[in-house]
Amino acid sequence: MADFLGMMKQAAQLQSKMKAMQAELDQIEVEGLSGGGLVKIRMSAKMEVRGVSIDPSLLKADEGEVLEDLLVAALADAHRKAEAAMQEKMQALTGGLGLPPGLGLG
């Protein structure tokens, strides 16, 4: 019975820490780049796009396809960085709990 109560207490603590971590993830901002910085996408670690910056040289009619490709690449870069930031926070949160690798709590 004491083990069960201990697990319940640990679960409540984990839930509280998860809420705090979600707030932290909202504050972390990463920037995805492509085209040597011609396209930039800002994103929170919660995968919310916060802004897009496009160099004016890409806004010409004949640059549409290039711009599309650079937007996709910048978004992918931002997504990778946001995912890495989230994984780092999750590892810090769950590192001492002995959870199996890859257990998605986020």
From Swiss-Prot:
Keyword DNA-binding set for record: yes
Q: Name one GO molecular function term.
A: DNA binding
A Gene Ontology cellular component where this protein is annotated is: cytosol
> Which region is the signal sequence?
none
Alphabetically list the UniProt keywords.
Answer: Cytoplasm, DNA-binding
* Highest taxon of the lineage: Bacteria
Q: Where in the cell is it found?
A: Cytoplasm, Nucleoid
What's the main place this protein lives? Answer: cytoplasm
Listed transmembrane segments? none
Q: Which InterPro entries match?
A: YbaB-like_sf (IPR036894), YbaB/EbfC (IPR004401)
Q: Name one Pfam family in it.
A: YbaB_DNA_bd
- Provide the assembly information: Homodimer.
Biological function: Binds to DNA and alters its conformation. May be involved in regulation of gene expression, nucleoid organization and DNA protection.
Q: Which NCBIfam families match?
A: DNA_YbaB_EbfC (TIGR00103)
Family statement: Belongs to the YbaB/EbfC family.
- Output this protein's name: Nucleoid-associated protein RPB_0667
